[in-house]
Amino acid sequence: MSAAPSELHEVFLNPGEFHFGESNTRISTLLGSCVSITLWHPRKRIGGMCHYMLTERKRPPNAALDGRFGSEAFELFLQHVAAAGTRPGEYQAKLFGGANMLTGPTGKQMDIGPRNVALGRQLLAANHIALMVEHVGGSGRRKLHFDVWSGDVWLAFPQGADAEIRNAHG
């Protein structure tokens, strides 16, 4: 665990929000069926987090990117990665969320969470970004804190026994 910087900049993401920051930043959020991806550049110690609610939409021409949608939140990442003079493959990713939180009118679980997770994995793979760890699925909420200075993500998941935990090594 790395010590926090003396001048810490804390950011809380609501659903649909995105933040990319410097090494003095801690980004936090609370997830259910939504998904957060963290990207971290280990050499430059910069990174960001998105918090998307749905996979995608039919985006109107000339519409601004909307972080509520995973495909567009990832485009925001790519813009910031390029603006930092870096390439996507230089980053490490972590993926969180995608719980089964919602039921449809018939009482059947909706698959919003699993679809959000699948999209996150696809976007990372398509951009050659290493997925270091993921904590996905289950049925509970997750609280995340991403320390950009170290790349560490702290996770609180009270109903954690039924979630899938994977890392790059098995």
From Swiss-Prot:
Mind telling me which Gene3D superfamilies this protein's record contains? Answer: 3.30.1330.200
Question: Organism's domain of life?
Answer: Bacteria
Keyword vocabulary terms for this entry: Chemotaxis, Hydrolase
Entry annotated with the keyword Cell inner membrane:
no
Supply the EC number(s).
3.5.1.44
Reaction(s) catalyzed by this protein? L-glutaminyl-[protein] + H2O = L-glutamyl-[protein] + NH4(+)
Single GO molecular function: protein-glutamine glutaminase activity
The Gene Ontology biological process annotation of the record reads:
chemotaxis
Query: What InterPro entries does the annotation carry?
Result: CheD-like_sf (IPR038592), Chemorcpt_Glu_NH3ase_CheD (IPR005659), Cytotoxic_necrot_fac-like_cat (IPR011324)
Q: What HAMAP family does the record tag this protein with?
A: CheD
Annotated family = Belongs to the CheD family.
Say what the protein does. Answer: Probably deamidates glutamine residues to glutamate on methyl-accepting chemotaxis receptors (MCPs), playing an important role in chemotaxis.
Q: What is this protein called?
A: Probable chemoreceptor glutamine deamidase CheD 3
Gene name, Swiss-Prot/TrEMBL: cheD3
